UniProtKB/Swiss-Prot annotation:
The keyword Secreted applies. Substrate binds at K312, Q354, E362, W406. This is 4-O-methyl-glucuronoyl methylesterase 1. Keywords: Disulfide bond, Hydrolase, Lignin degradation, Secreted, Serine esterase, Signal.
Length: 496
């Protein structure tokens, strides 16, 4: 009997020891019911109100508070209890045949690694670009062709593709994201004590905000702008710029519309959704870095990252701000790396996935104009493979989770596989990566499976030291009856 009791006490003691979150795991946030402390050598930091994460550095931190929500929690929060370390898929494996065109697990680069700095895709000039017809045009149940203009003309050159990018950007802003403002009249900045202070003035109004800068080395270090805080490991030699995107545009709930410093400057009725406002904030950070050498950052080697809701924002920032050298959206799902049409298709298959009709009820990430189109996205002349395509040929590394049904595991894979054709057309496949793996919590970076990929992208496009494969199209999920070829009925031109 004593032996049994002793064994039970040992089990309980072991359980208590384990009641801490591990590296890159969740450790707090609204609705969180798991451990609030981190294992030794990690600190619980706040990414946003909904998600706190254990990151390397420091000793165990005190338990962060988890305030009760003042509004109903969203329908896509991080897990409310810690999942197993290697969770099975949340739906039974598909019984249909495997895809007719399975993705390569990690295809080799189709061209040699670049020996010069990566392309930067400057904003296309409007001088010789065709005018865009008004209206939505004809609907399309499949993904719209990124190589055909809205007027039906075909893209036949790299210059044409820049015009097409300009057209797509305009259409996405008009029908989904809201207007991305032109550069403001004035941006001033100063740097002191690892804080970059920024003041923006436009049309008689001014706002100020600041970001913190840590890490890096030398007077012109590359940097990654992290929405909230980084949920990926940032290597030595690369600075981290922590951007409080909620300060620029609030994202507490559907009642947050028009709140934040962006709207103080441009008015609460501005058409921009929160993600567009955040992208504007990123642009102003880069303005400030260009004006403030004392910050020690090379503004031509800046990346952007975020996870979940902030990952959606990172994708939009990369699409709207051409000075970003590397975009790393992590588990962004619907509104980010997923295509609306494929998310709807998944829902029609009985899967629990975030759809466009649902996302507009959850938050204010998109412009209010999207409320008019969320129930009929087949009428839109674009989808998110083209949002991603606004980044081409700049570098994009998309991190997704093959175990999370809500993110749209097929919608993200299919959408980014379609997006990849734009890098292919430009001869820039080495600048595109999509990696969808499982066995980790939401927003918990899977170091065992993705560190080499992440490091290869950072080395090549920020540190500019080369090394590693950066042409990646990888998924660990069987996508069943999904047939990529049926969703991408276009030929890929040679625009090199």
């Amino acid at each position: 009997m004593k032996s049994t009791v002793a064994s039970a006490l040992l089990v309980l003691a072991g359980t208590a020891v384990q009641a801490q979150s591990g590296p890159w795991q969740q450790c707090g946030g609204i609705g969180w019911q798991g451990p609030f402390t981190c294992v030794s050598g990690h600190t619980c930091q706040v990414l946003n109100d909904w998600y706190h994460q254990c990151v390397p550095g420091g000793g165990p931190s005190p338990p962060p508070t988890s305030p009760p929500p003042t509004t109903p929690p969203p329908t896509s929060p991080p897990p409310t209890s810690p999942p197993p370390t290697s969770p099975p898929p949340t739906s039974p494996p598909p019984t249909s045949p495997p895809p007719t065109s399975p993705p390569p697990t990690s295809p080799p680069p189709t061209s040699p690694p670049p020996t010069s700095p990566p392309p930067t895709s400057p904003p296309p000039s409007s001088g010789s670009c065709p005018s865009t017809p008004g209206g939505l045009g004809s609907g399309n149940q499949r993904l719209p062709d990124p190589f055909t203009f809205h007027n039906g003309n075909t893209v036949t050159s790299a210059a044409d593709f820049q015009c097409r990018q300009r057209e797509v950007s305009s259409l996405i802003q008009q029908y989904e994201l809201g207007q991305f403002p032109a550069p403001p009249q004035s941006v001033t900045s100063s740097y002191s004590g690892n804080t970059l202070s920024i003041t923006v003035s436009d049309q008689g109004r001014s706002i100020s905000f600041s970001v913190s800068i840590s890490g890096g080395s030398g007077s012109k270090s590359p940097a990654i702008i992290a929405y909230g805080a980084p949920s990926i490991p940032v290597p030595n030699g690369v600075a981290t710029i922590r951007f409080n995107n909620d300060d620029i545009a609030a994202q507490q709930s559907g009642s947050s519309r028009g709140q934040g410093k962006f709207y103080n400057l441009y008015g609460s009725g501005h058409s921009a959704g929160a993600m567009t406002a955040w992208a504007w904030g990123v642009a102003r950070i880069i303005d400030a870095l260009e004006k403030t050498p004392a910050a020690g950052i090379d503004p031509t080697r800046v990346g952007v990252t975020g996870c979940s809701r902030n990952g959606k924002g990172a994708m939009v920032a990369g699409a709207l701000e051409p000075r970003i050298a590397l975009t790393i959206p992590q588990e962004s799902g619907s509104g980010g790396s997923a295509c609306w049409r494929i998310s709807n298709w998944q829902g029609q298959q009985g899967q629990n996935v975030q759809t466009p009709a649902q996302i507009i009820t959850e938050n204010v990430w998109l412009g209010p104009v999207f409320n008019n189109h969320a129930n009929n996205v087949n009428a839109l002349p674009f989808d998110h493979h083209q949002l991603a395509g606004l980044i081409a040929p700049r570098a994009l590394y998309v991190i997704e989770n093959s175990d999370m049904e809500w993110l749209g595991w097929t919608a993200t894979y299919g959408c980014m596989a379609a997006a990849r054709t734009q890098w292919e057309a430009l001869g820039a496949l080495d600048n595109f990566g999509f990696s969808q793996v499982g066995g980790n919590q939401h927003c918990s970076f899977n170091s065992g499976k993705q560190s080499a990929e992440l490091n290869a992208f950072i080395n090549k496009f920020l540190l500019q030291s080369g090394g590693g494969t950066t042409s990646i199209l990888r998924t660990e999920r069987n996508h069943g009856s999904f047939n990529l070829a049926e969703w991408t009925p276009w030929n890929v031109p040679n625009l090199r």
